Amino acid sequence: MSDPAQALGQGDVMTIQEVLLPLFLEVILTFVLLFWLAPLRGSDFSSGVTRPENVALREPNWSKRSLQVAYSYSNQFELPVLFYVLTILAWVTRHADLIFVVLAWVFVIFRYLQAFVHVTSNQVRLRGAFFGVSALVLAIMWIIYMIEILTAPWV
């Protein structure tokens, strides 16, 4: 067997574009939140809501809007990091099949839904439900990947 995918017992591996598009959209979400946050914080400074010396002492009084966007932005460096790692591993080991890509899309869609609720109504139950679905989907992706890797024949 010269094809690594066949040697690892894999079916059809998706194209790099199909695999990375959900990851790219998650990265875009992170940058959208960042570039939204910057002017909000600038406005907080110019309106006097927040003072630079308070930020330096880690005691800022950001506006509610700034806090919502900041927390949503910060949240993009928690669970999505595991998604980024898994996507790269799945591609490199040729385990990024159709099931992987579909689950990746579900993960990213629920991350967008969570971020949307976070920066709009901020309904904790709804936001938590969206987070829970994305966390469960990512856990399933990791479990499938681990099983595939651990049960693959040695090449």
Where are the language model's segments positioned?
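Alpha-helical transmembrane segments
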Residues: 19-33
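Core segments of transmembrane alpha-helices
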Residues: 74-89
